Amino acid sequence: MTLPLQGNRIREIATELTDAEPVMIINTHYHLDHTHGNPAFAPGTRVLSTERTLSHLQALDTDFWTGDAAQLLPNETFSDRRRIVVGSKTIDLMHVGRGHTDGDLVVLLPDENAVHMGDLHFNRHYPNIDLEAGGSVRDWPMTLERVLEFEFEIVSPGHGATTDRDGIRQFQSFMAQLSQIGSDAAAQGTSLADTLQTDRLTADEGYEPISFVVSLGLDRPFVLQRAWEEATGNFERLN
């Protein structure tokens, strides 16, 4: 839900499908493409997220969440897990570790044998790695391993086409390889410039940068830089 306009369309579709107004919003993390549609919904709508997501919205996205929009900030938060029932459907919301940010949640839909991953899964796209909001290249593979302990077959990623458990495993392999490159660079004192030239990142075959109207800069050099920055603790940028 990047913009209220898109939130309006989602609200319309949900109403058409159910003959009722939506009663709940789930924000998987704080980034604008997953939260800025909230104000399109009615004040008083349940808005669920992790505690960390609410903290990030209040600290890192303050300009947007003013006036009427503030009424659609998350109003039900939790630290690790929350089970909710909507009609006959059970939905499990779970924070299982750091990855994209430190507040990501996954949405398990047992009746549909499905999981929505939020941005813990970019299917065949280079991911945004928000170290500033507690994201972690190093922890991401283990977080995905915890997700794979649950029972599901259908996987809805935060970005990219619907996939399956093998799609998560492929992305997990990519993140593990990226983490190892960063760790080795830190141990060997490899510069950022040299790290960006590595030919060791091979699990990204077929990956594409995400773009909307303009490029977001989420590409191979970006993820290598983020891995190097986390591993070395050096956040100086190349010009």
Report each predicted region and the residues it spans.
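Non-catalytic beta-strand/loop surface segments
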Residues: E76, D80-R82, G87
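Acidic/polar short surface loop at catalytic or gating sites that assists cofactor/ion binding
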Residues: L48-N75
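Active-site metal-binding motif and surrounding structural segment of the metallo-beta-lactamase
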Residues: P4-L48
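Accessory terminal helices/loops
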Residues: E149-E151, T162-N239
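Divalent metal-coordination and catalytic microenvironments
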Residues: A14, H29, F41, V47, ...
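Conserved acidic residues
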Residues: V23, N75, E153
